[in-house]
Amino acid sequence: MNLFPRLLGDVGGSNARFAWQASASAPLSHIQVLSCSQYLGIAEAIEAYLTGNGLTSPVAAGIGIANPITGDQVVMTNHHWSFSIEQLQQQLSLNRLQVINDFTALALALPCLTTEQKVQIGGKEPIQNAPVALLGAGTGLGVSGLMPSGQHVLPISGEGGHVTLAAQNAKEFAVIELIGQKYGH
């Protein structure tokens, strides 16, 4: 299946970053950051990106989004956008659309880093084939990881900013109770 040209996206609660890749060996081009608040939905942001850069329709797209992906329907946690992955694929006339959690995408890229690009935290010597954690702040708190599995790694998805907290005292319990009333945690 031909997957080029393709659109690549990193969608957060505040910004949507898009890039174009014309072929497998081509560098990323037309890199642009759009404010999510300026568009009704992800389809409108993508169409504005394509039109604004004079690009034709992509054949495929890969999007990392700051949200759990548990099925076809995506309802963003930190923004008002919601969409069906299948309907977005049809609307954009894509042969293939892959939507995954943004930090899962970052975790899957970790094996591509060179030794010089990595920083070890703690310990004396790196442990080969050990689990790897990834943590980063954006509009929310992204977390992910990689778990070794034979010759491969398996990504572990998570939403660090949406975890249930354990209270250590009455004051913390009261704060968590208020948060729970508003957000359901």
Placement of each model-derived feature along the sequence:
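A glycine- and small-aliphatic-rich helix-loop capping segment at beta-alpha/alpha-beta transitions
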Residues: 23-25, 78-82, 113-121, 148-156
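Glycine-rich phosphate-binding loop signature in dinucleotide/nucleotide-binding domains
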Residues: 53-57, 126-129
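Short glycine-rich, Thr/Ser-proximal phosphate-binding strand/loop in the N-terminal lobe
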Residues: 2-52, 154-162
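Short, acidic Gly/Pro/Ser/Thr-rich loop/turn segments
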Residues: 16, 68-70, 140-144
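Adenine-nucleotide phosphate-binding core of ATP-dependent small-molecule kinases
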Residues: 31-35, 56, 181-185
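Active-site flanking residues adjacent to catalytic metal/cofactor-binding acidic residues
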Residues: 9, 101, 137
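Glycine/GP-enriched mid-protein hinge/lid loop-to-helix segment characteristic of carbohydrate kinases
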Residues: 123-133, 140-185
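Short beta-strand-loop/turn "lid" adjacent to the catalytic site in phosphate-handling enzymes
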Residues: 54-99, 104-117, 134
